[in-house]
Design a protein with these regions (language model features):
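VWA/integrin I-like adhesion module and closely mimicked acidic/polar interface patches used
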Residues: 72, 158-199
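Second-shell loop/turn segments in exported
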Residues: 40-50, 82, 98-101, 115-126, ...
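Von Willebrand factor
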Residues: 31-98, 102, 106-149, 151-155, 182-192, ...
Length: 234
């Protein structure tokens, strides 16, 4: 246990140094978006092939929803940017879909197609929400565009069981001006919503959306995306 905690502390220290050295440089870029959104979803041992597919198809369908397409065009810049991260253990995170600027139905359909065809790239492992947040924050530290708001959207069905303490990772990321939201998939841990609310989310307007199970994920992610996009464009 002591060795694991030492490793977790070292991982957090490395991540903080990386974030400190990567201040956003996006103001120099030509493209500005209303929100830069990292969709980070769980590929740990508890997520089987069917459950992975329900997450993938649920996110893809959401970006075809007319209400979401209208919302993402409603801000001052008329566009948002999205990237998709798959994660499991503290050393397993990967960008499954790179940054994609979405400014209307054509770009939204292209993103939906990319997500809908996205293979499972992250191998199963333990559940390190903290490492996933730190990794996602690194993607937001120096994106190829300027963003009025930066958000990490974490979907999971479990609690943090590897890597840095979740509250420490959350606090470090929020201190960089990043909002962390959660989607609790309540098929295994019945108190997950409260756990994420107390330990993971943070930043202006942070919230947790709940899916009753993986079959309910599509409904929940649609509501969650609307809640994230509309405040940014309002």
């Amino acid at each position: 246990m002591r060795r694991l905690r030492t490793h977790a502390a070292a991982l957090l220290s490395v991540a903080l140094l990386a974030l400190a050295g990567r201040a956003p440089h996006a103001e120099a870029q030509d493209t500005r978006v209303d929100i830069a959104l990292v969709l980070a979803f769980d590929c740990s041992y508890s997520v089987d092939a069917r459950e992975y597919d329900l997450q993938r198809r649920g996110i893809a369908r959401a970006f075809l929803d007319p209400e979401i397409v209208t919302a993402l065009q409603a801000g001052p810049n008329g566009r948002i940017a999205v990237t998709v991260v798959q994660w499991s253990a503290d050393d397993i995170q990967t960008v499954a879909v790179p940054w994609h600027v979405v400014d209307g139905p054509v770009a939204a359909a292209e993103l939906a197609d990319r997500i809908g065809r996205m293979p499972r790239l992250a191998p199963p492992g333990s559940t390190s929400i903290s490492a996933a947040i730190l990794y996602s924050a690194g993607l937001l530290a120096s994106p190829p565009f300027a963003a009025d708001k930066r958000v990490i959207d974490v979907a999971t069905d479990g609690i943090n069981n590897l890597g840095p303490w979740l509250k420490d990772a959350r606090d470090a990321v929020v201190a960089r001006g990043i909002t962390v939201n959660g989607l609790a998939i309540q098929d295994e841990v019945d108190y997950l919503h409260h756990y994420l609310r107390n330990r993971m989310i943070g930043g202006p307007g942070a919230f947790v959306e709940t899916a009753n199970d993986y079959d309910d994920f599509g409904r929940a992610i649609r509501i969650k995306l609307l809640r994230e996009i509309l405040p940014a464009v309002g």
